[in-house]
Amino acid sequence: MKRIILLLLALVLVLALMACGGKEPEDAADAADNSTLSNSAQLSITEASYLEYDNSQITCRFRKDEDGWKWVDNEGFPLDAAYIEETLAALDAMSASLTPVEPAVEAADAGLDDAQRYLTVTVGEETTTLRFGDQKDDGQWYMAIDGQEGTYLVADEFVQRMDRSVYSMAVLPTLPELTDENLTVITLRSGAEDKAVRLTKTDEGWFRENRQVTEQVQAMEAALADFTFDSCFNYDPSPDAAPLCGLDAPTATITAAYVNTVGTETTLTLTLGTLREDGSYYVTLNDDTTVYLVSQDKVAAFLALL
């Protein structure tokens, strides 16, 4: 009798262990379901190979190959991929916490029947598209996922990431080191008045014709040392861009002759177009047609001599 009781207890224990073991796959399945944007390859969204977003005004498309991320519309564009990677990381984090709105909301009531914003991401072999509808009073946006029935709410901070244009992701050029040690001549030319100023360095300092202008040149040297482009305005522009930006008849042209690191004299030219209402000039660098924006205070020291 005692042996029978022990056998029964052992059987109960085995059944209990089987029940516990049987629950683990169910929990794992639930966890997988909670990853709303999961894919069959179980890759992280940060491993995506394609990203596209549209906010009804701008469309940005990017693809990744062995050399990194590229802008699909012009793969020669000097793209800083940091913003793309940040967006994918934000999408990955958002996906882990998405839950459908309860009670359910009709697509028409959430602005999803005619969504004006979308984001598409490709991870492995799978492509997922998110569509964004109306924004609620609390700032959140309704979102739907193509191929799924649920409606979700996402933070405004994430949706705002689709408001950034590709030009704001450009790697901006930098000027070579230009100091009193390697500068030899600075030439300023005003397009409007056809006026030219040539500043030449001698052993006694900087001169404009026969008048010493060392102090004025020091201000220009400081401006050159701190000079940075504010943003990219137009990359690989059409021929119409130059007259539209006032670069066909520039406000001023600044040319600096200097001795480079290998001991050869070379030149650098900044061409200033129209002054915009926001206080920035359209600017090009050397023979590159890319148009940049530069605030007027960065070139004030040069224009003061014209």
Task: Describe every region a protein language model picked out.
Residues 8-14:
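Core hydrophobic alpha-helical membrane-spanning segments
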Residues 16-19:
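C-terminal motif of bacterial Sec signal peptides marking the signal peptidase cleavage site
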Residues 5-8, 21-306:
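A short-motif feature that recognizes glycine-rich, charge-decorated loops
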